[in-house]
């Protein structure tokens, strides 16, 4: 039986030199890489937290999904990841395609398989991250803080 996605996850931020937040990458991996390089991001000492919506609109959505597998990346689930998961699960692609999911259709078969595998892993992304750092507690969500 599959375990449901944790709604809330905690991160011990004190183990990282710097914690960087990035919202709505939307498939623009090279732009993110340039910014991280500019900030002297060190994947062995720093943490990148994505605030969701790593896919759609930009040219590198598959690579952005694969970024989530890196040891130095954590993420909360955004509405674009949820749209993609729902579209594939229920074979109803229209809403996702209207919101930038056309990159998936343009992929070769083997890349679509990779994207599906990566999107399945997104089911385990929390909706809320709580980071405890030297400066206190920080709560990260994509858009709305769930009131339940």
Identify the role of each PLM range.
Residues 137-148:
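Divalent-metal (often Zn2+) His-rich catalytic cores of metallo-beta-lactamase-fold enzymes
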Residues 13-19, 131-138:
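Beta-strand-turn-beta hairpins that frame and shape the catalytic cleft
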């Amino acid at each position: 039986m599959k375990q449901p996605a944790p709604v809330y996850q905690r991160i011990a931020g004190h183990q990282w030199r710097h914690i960087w937040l990035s919202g709505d990458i939307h498939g623009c991996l090279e732009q993110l890489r340039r910014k991280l390089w500019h900030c002297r991001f060190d994947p062995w000492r720093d943490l990148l937290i994505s605030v969701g919506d790593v896919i759609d609109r930009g040219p590198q959505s598959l690579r952005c999904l694969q970024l989530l597998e890196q040891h130095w990346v954590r993420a909360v689930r955004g509405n674009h990841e949820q749209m993609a998961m729902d579209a594939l699960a229920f074979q109803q692609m229209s809403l996702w395609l209207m919101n930038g999911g056309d990159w998936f259709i343009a992929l070769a078969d083997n890349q679509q398989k990779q994207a599906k595998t990566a999107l399945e892993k997104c089911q385990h992304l929390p909706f809320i991250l709580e980071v405890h750092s030297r400066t206190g507690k920080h709560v990260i969500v994509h858009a709305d803080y769930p009131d339940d």
